[in-house]
Curated annotation (Swiss-Prot):
Belongs to the iron/manganese superoxide dismutase family. It comes from Rhizobium meliloti (strain 1021). Binds 1 Mn(2+) ion per subunit. The lineage of its organism: Bacteria, Pseudomonadati, Pseudomonadota, Alphaproteobacteria, Hyphomicrobiales. InterPro entries: Mn/Fe_SOD, Mn/Fe_SOD_BS, Mn/Fe_SOD_C, Mn/Fe_SOD_N, Mn/Fe_SOD_N_sf, SOD_C_sf. The gene is sodB. Destroys superoxide anion radicals which are normally produced within the cells and which are toxic to biological systems. This is Superoxide dismutase [Mn]. Transmembrane segments: none annotated. Its cofactor is Mn(2+). Signal peptide: none annotated. Keywords: Manganese, Metal-binding, Oxidoreductase. Mn(2+) binds at H27, H77, D160, H164.
Length: 200
């Protein structure tokens, strides 16, 4: 299937002051658009255009790095925009998700610390993740455009730690960006939706 740039599910000003209009304009309108444009060209050249995005990501991993980079980043960003909302974050998680975080990760405070540490500790560009693997939640980090799909897990929350995600708003203070993301931006309803789908 052809890659398409999704519209943001909120206005460009909606996430301020935690993520500015300028960041969203550059990140969505330029960076994500480039992954879509390049990904479509590379998928067509590889004869994989008819596959789903998830299948293109899995098939290109380790076999077609240019395609994987763009397909992986497109997949990651399609979800990234939905993982945020105005007035998001905080400790009031949906019950089922709260229970899973308690049983699998040791509770919200430990999740917050470990998820933020994964993002802060990713050397260079990459992502931090909350995923479902073998029925349990796990936190991980990946370089560049890689994601948990290629490691047998289903991502239900991710945060982009490429510099273009935060440099306009936070300069080199990646931990402050991660703190703002967790405390003020996460769309826990969307995380729950993905968790329930992955747990089936």
């Amino acid at each position: 299937m052809a890659f398409e740039l999704p519209n943001l599910p909120y206005d460009y000003d909606a996430l301020a002051p935690y993520m500015s209009r300028e960041t969203l304009e550059y990140h969505h309108d330029k960076h994500h658009l480039a992954y879509v444009t390049n990904g479509n060209k590379l998928a067509e050249e590889a004869g994989l255009s008819d596959l789903s995005l998830e299948d293109i990501v899995k098939k290109s991993y380790g076999t077609n790095q240019p395609l994987f980079n763009n397909a992986g980043q497109h997949y990651n960003h399609v979800h990234f925009w939905k993982w945020m909302k105005k007035g998001g974050g905080g400790t009031s998680l949906p019950g089922k998700l709260d229970a899973a975080i308690k049983s699998d990760l040791g509770g919200y405070d430990k999740f917050r610390a470990d998820f933020s540490a994964a993002g802060a500790g990713q050397f260079g560009s990459g992502w931090a993740w909350l995923s479902v693997k073998n029925g349990k939640l796990e936190i991980s980090k990946t370089p560049n455009g890689e994601n948990p799909l290629v490691h047998g897990a289903t991502p239900i929350l991710g945060v982009d730690v490429w510099e273009h995600s935060y440099y306009i708003d936070y300069r080199n203070a990646r931990p402050k960006y991660l703190e703002a993301f967790v405390d003020n931006l996460i769309n826990w309803d969307y995380v729950l939706e993905l968790y329930e789908a992955a747990a089936k």
